[in-house]
């Protein structure tokens, strides 16, 4: 399941799924991620793993609370802003997750911009 507010991103995702022979096993929704997560939590959907790549401002508290209530075993959080990622990781850790790994990726050489990737696991 892929959720993206930008409809053009959904078109690209569907094209990539088709190119990789995954069109029948992938679903994509053009919707605000917080809105989607709140609906998923209300419907008590099952999510085993969650990948998050929010805008520079980070995730909303409502999104994070919904993620915690859905209780995926693993959350991968990709960020272009280490400060907001740190804030959001603290929220997730207070909700029962522990930080398993944190990596820095220099995708923009010779600039001050970096991507960080955090992997969290739900505590048993």
Task: Name each model feature, range by range.
Residues 1-124:
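Rossmann-like S-adenosyl-L-methionine
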